[in-house]
Amino acid sequence: LVQMSVSDMNYKEIPEEVEFTEKIGAIAFNLYFLVCTGRGQGNTDISNAAYEEALKMLYEQQMKYKGKLMINSKCAPQYKRVVYENDPDSVYTRTYSGGCPAATHYSRISPEGNLTPCPFIEESVGNLKSRSFKDLWENAPLMIQLRDRKQLDGKCGTCEFSAMCSGCRARAFAETGNYMDPDPSCDYEPGKHGGKAITLKVEDTLGLEVEFQTQWTPEAKERLERIPSF
């Protein structure tokens, strides 16, 4: 596995780094985009123009090394939009999780037991010493808000790709103090693809809201009951 953090200084080296990844026999390449929060607030972020170009370069490499390398972006929900613009039927669009993963696919638990929606969001929604993970995940107001794409403001709220992208909520908060404001790293202007919300078939929307019921065996239920956080 090779991982690269992208910036204005090195984004043009993406093809070389992917080539290097294959050359050394690695099976995966991840391109990380800085989220300027916490200790990263004073770091130099990539410009919006370079951000978009880097995503397009990554897609080109994904096609070039298809079947040879697993190539992915991290902290760049807009990548799914770039893939869709090139190939609406891409396996990546159909099976990769939809949008910002904060409160939808992952969260963070601090050493003190505080639960936050994302490693880049510092606001705690509660502590696992007093409330279960399940309770906080399902009922904490901030977790519910972040999962509701209808609450997105500005161009993220009117974007055709809000369901599959939604922008980075940590970047929005770092910029304006509002979790639902537009992602400042994105220059895409809604309307380019007609303005109508683009949705995928339910069976193709891993990570988006799908109704299902989990069936637990009696043995599994017994084991779960012994775990305090659940």
Residue ranges and their predicted role:
Residues 101, 148, 216:
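Residue-level marker of regulatory loop/turn positions in helix-turn-helix DNA-binding domains and
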Residues 120-209:
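Flexible mid-to-C-terminal extensions adjoining Fe-S/redox cofactors in radical SAM and related proteins
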Residues 104-105, 184, 212:
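Structural beta-strand/beta-sheet cores of well-ordered domains, especially the beta-sheet scaffolds
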Residues 1-112, 116-131:
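Radical SAM enzyme [4Fe-4S]-AdoMet core and its adjacent flexible, acidic
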Residues 17, 136-139, 227:
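Generic alpha-helical secondary-structure signal
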